[in-house]
Regions:
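Catalytic cores of nucleotide-enabled group-transfer and carboxylate-activating enzymes in metabolic
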Residues: 2, 6, 19-34, 180, ...
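Beta-strand-turn-beta hairpins that frame and shape the catalytic cleft
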Residues: 1-2, 23-29, 152-161, 180-189
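Pre-active-site segment of Zn-dependent metallo-hydrolases
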Residues: 9-11, 22-84, 88-142, 197-205
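Short acidic-hydrophobic, aromatic-tinged amphipathic segments that line or gate anion-handling sites
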Residues: 141-150
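Divalent metal-coordination and catalytic microenvironments
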Residues: 3, 33, 65-66, 96, ...
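A short catalytic or substrate-binding loop motif that flags glycine-/basic-rich loops and adjacent residues
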Residues: 9-13, 155, 166-171
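Short beta-strand scaffold segments in enzyme catalytic cores
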Residues: 14-19, 172-177
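Cap/insert and terminal regions of metallo-dependent hydrolase folds
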Residues: 174, 195-225
């Protein structure tokens, strides 16, 4: 198993983790989250960088929660050729029906505003680029499959997914992914997503995870809960 961190490593936004495993004699690839980089021109440029592989080669995406720095580039990924399922909780899917169209609208608005200022001779610097359209968002939403907390879901032969409650926002999850590669014992890979704090009124405490062979944990609250 190989894990490649394409964002949110040494930085806060742009959560994108690519996992490669060997199953039934061939290499399989999947993503955990596919978020947008946020925070100025440098972040905007990162959102335009090509992946080190073709999106068509991805088998599926596991999405921990709806925040844009974890989900916001999914329409771009799908527009570039990814056709597989995107797994998340029902609450996350309901939030994304609002957040992703809104993201497309804001991007288009930024471009339109810049074009008006450019025509008036008042624009300085690089022109913003819309990463995806409302139509591409609608196509992306059709690729989602809901997996609820505590439900075991086979994503591929040798890969099982279970979501636990992360207590971060509505629908947020800790993703438990059990992987049995060719000729190897099963390993549990746990992706924390963003973890909530204990004792909050509006959200439940994050679930406790008893064991993991590989743990990928966020570093804002991951050492406090």
């Amino acid at each position: 198993m190989k894990i490649q961190f394409l964002g949110a490593a040494g930085e806060v936004t742009g959560s994108r983790h690519c996992v490669e495993v060997m199953l039934s004699g061939r290499s399989r690839h999947f993503m955990v989250d596919y978020g947008m980089f946020q925070g100025g021109r440098e972040a905007a440029n990162k959102n335009l960088e090509p992946l080190p592989f073709s999106p068509k080669d991805l088998d599926f995406v596991v999405l921990t929660h709806a925040h844009i720095d974890h989900s916001g580039l999914l329409p771009r990924l799908c527009a570039q050729g990814f056709k597989g399922p995107i797994y998340c909780t029902g609450a996350t899917f309901e939030l994304l029906k609002i957040l992703l169209p809104d993201s497309a609208y804001l991007q288009r608005s930024d471009v339109d505003r810049a074009e008006r200022k450019q025509k008036a001779g008042k624009w300085r610097g690089e022109m913003p680029i819309a990463l995806y359209s409302r139509e591409e968002v609608e196509m992306t939403l059709a690729q989602f499959e809901v997996v609820e907390y505590g439900q075991s879901k086979e994503l591929a032969p040798g890969i099982q997914l279970e979501f636990r409650n992360a207590g971060h926002i509505l629908g947020s999850t800790i993703a438990l992914i059990d992987i049995t590669e060719d000729g190897k014992q099963q390993k549990r890979c746990v992706f924390s997503g963003d973890i909530g704090m204990k004792g909050k009124v509006l959200m439940p405490d994050p679930d406790l995870i008893a064991s993991a062979d590989v743990l990928v944990v966020e570093s804002t609250y991951g050492d406090r809960t």
